């Protein structure tokens, strides 16, 4: 059995401002770095075999901070762990999204959710084949993790995926199963933020509300 611990990156300024990031390469802010360090302290109580991440800088920096806390080598960047592409909606706030693309209007260039799930699940499957019986930390993004949760446990979890939260999965005989949404080992990262946590991505929140 291979176990995966999917981690969302730490906070960025666009997260704080509730702007849609997608594949826009927005770095961590100071809160995000503190979240990553706190998560690293918690994960250091456990043993892991490998850390991989999305190629975007917010995920890579989170993964590097965690790897340093664990005394592990620099994480491997895997392109197919990149965040969902939100096309022309990237950089928009919720109000701007509603004005430019009201509910029901297609957002030009937005990646289909099913395509996100396909590439991410394929990546996890490939990692499980190459690293059987390993415990692997995967630092990625909210929509990436959401796609895997929906693949493994469709319709069961609608709660926001917080910065530096951990969601654990098992991979046995080619089957991916959700072990824990918000794994108990995680840091409650919203306690490090200045305001009550709500879903930071208005496009994802709107789509999730429709099922």
Regions found by a protein language model. Name each.
Residues 5-61, 109-121:
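Loop-to-helix element that buttresses phosphate recognition and phosphoryl-transfer chemistry
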Residues 72, 84-95, 150-211:
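Acidic, low-complexity terminal tails and accessory targeting/binding regions
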Residues 45-47, 127-134:
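Glycine-rich phosphate-binding loop signature in dinucleotide/nucleotide-binding domains
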Residues 12, 144-145:
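Short active-site segment of divalent metal-dependent hydrolases/proteases
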Residues 4, 134-140:
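Generic beta-sheet signal
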Residues 37-100:
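Phosphate-coordination/substrate-recognition cap region in phosphate-metabolizing enzymes
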Residues 65, 147, 151:
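Active-site signature of alpha/beta-hydrolase-fold catalytic machinery across serine-
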Residues 97-115, 200-210:
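Short glycine/proline- and acidic residue-enriched helix-loop micro-motifs
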């Amino acid at each position: 059995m291979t176990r995966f611990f999917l981690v969302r990156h730490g906070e960025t300024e666009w997260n704080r401002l509730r702007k849609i990031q997608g594949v826009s390469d927005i770095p961590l802010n100071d809160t995000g770095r503190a979240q990553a360090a706190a998560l690293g302290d918690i994960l250091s109580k456990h043993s892991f075999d490998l850390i991989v991440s999305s190629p975007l800088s917010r995920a890579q920096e989170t993964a590097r901070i965690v790897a340093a806390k664990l005394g592990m080598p620099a994480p491997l960047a895997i392109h197919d762990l990149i965040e969902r592409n939100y096309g022309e909606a990237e950089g928009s706030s919720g109000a701007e999204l509603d004005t430019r693309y009201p509910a029901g209007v297609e957002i030009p260039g937005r990646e289909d959710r099913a395509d996100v799930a396909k590439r991410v699940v394929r990546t996890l499957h490939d990692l499980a084949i190459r690293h059987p019986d390993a415990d692997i930390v995967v630092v990625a993004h909210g929509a990436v993790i959401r796609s895997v949760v929906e693949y493994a446990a469709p319709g069961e979890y609608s709660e926001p995926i917080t910065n530096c939260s951990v969601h654990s999965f098992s991979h046995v005989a080619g089957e991916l199963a959700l072990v824990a949404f918000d794994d108990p080992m995680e840091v409650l990262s919203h306690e490090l933020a200045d305001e009550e946590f709500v879903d930071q991505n208005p496009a994802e929140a709107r789509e999730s509300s429709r099922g």
